[in-house]
């Protein structure tokens, strides 16, 4: 049997699935061809060496993206379309099933929404009594270090859309997902305010560059 490492990316994907591919192999499939003197696999490695992790490539603006040799406006447009389709797929997936049944989908959705933000964004997922998504709202926008959060505004919005439960989320632009004391304090304030209205706070997720910290999973709720 042929060794996995000897297969070209497309063959490897068909044989073992997309999860078996490295970042540069996935990017090579997207790029399709290389440039003169630089085969596609080498070009893919060069691109990732330039940008670093995938999230940096995906969040690059048009100028930064197209400044790299071998990349152009066509690839930029295609990548933006793929990223947006991923966001919409995850949102539709959450709309079709109770969120509590699939916490990993929630994490993936929040990563696609918040991991590239350069300032703190505080988002709330409003859920019905079956824990299905009613809507998502970016309620507060802050600096690179902190965002001002007002529990009364969250509860007001929850009552307006008749939400029975909430999932709180915000990003740390630093990439460090460990909650600060102020994160824990505001979570408790929101939780207390929600309980007065018989609304449950199911979780508070802190989004980094590639992962999420869950208050619920770490027994902080």
Curated annotation (Swiss-Prot):
InterPro entries: MPN (IPR037518), RadC_JAB (IPR025657), RuvA_2-like (IPR010994), UPF0758 (IPR001405), UPF0758_CS (IPR020891), UPF0758_N (IPR046778). A motif (JAMM motif) lies at residues 170-183. Residues 99-221 form the MPN domain. One of its GO terms (biological process) is proteolysis. Pfam families: RadC (PF04002), UPF0758_N (PF20582). Keywords: Hydrolase, Metal-binding, Metalloprotease, Protease, Zinc. SUPFAM superfamilies: RuvA domain 2-like (SSF47781). Transmembrane segments: none annotated. GO terms for molecular function: metal ion binding; metallopeptidase activity. Zn(2+) binds at residues 170, 172, 183. Belongs to the UPF0758 family. PANTHER family: DNA REPAIR PROTEIN RADC, UPF0758 PROTEIN YEES-RELATED. This is UPF0758 protein HI_0952.
């Amino acid at each position: 049997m042929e060794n996995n490492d000897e297969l070209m990316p497309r063959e490897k994907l068909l044989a073992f699935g997309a999860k078996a591919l490295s970042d540069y192999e996935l990017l090579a499939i997207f790029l399709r061809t290389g440039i003169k003197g630089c085969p596609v696999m080498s070009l893919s490695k060069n691109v990732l060496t330039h940008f670093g992790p995938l999230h940096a490539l995906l969040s690059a603006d048009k100028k930064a993206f197209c400044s790299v040799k071998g990349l152009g406006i066509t690839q930029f447009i295609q990548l933006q379309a793929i990223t947006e389709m991923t966001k919409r797929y995850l949102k539709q997936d959450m709309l079709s099933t109770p969120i509590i049944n699939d916490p990993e989908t929630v994490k993936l959705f929040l990563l696609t929404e918040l991991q590239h933000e350069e300032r703190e964004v505080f988002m709330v997922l409003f859920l019905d009594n079956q824990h299905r998504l009613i809507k998502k709202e970016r309620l507060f926008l802050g600096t690179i270090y902190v965002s001002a959060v007002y529990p009364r505004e969250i509860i007001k919005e929850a009552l307006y859309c008749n939400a029975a439960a909430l999932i709180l989320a915000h990003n740390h632009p630093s990439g460090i997902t460990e909650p600060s004391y102020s994160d824990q304090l505001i979570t408790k304030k929101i939780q207390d305010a929600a309980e007065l209205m018989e609304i449950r706070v199911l979780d508070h997720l802190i989004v980094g560059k590639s992962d999420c910290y869950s208050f619920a999973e770490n027994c902080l709720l």
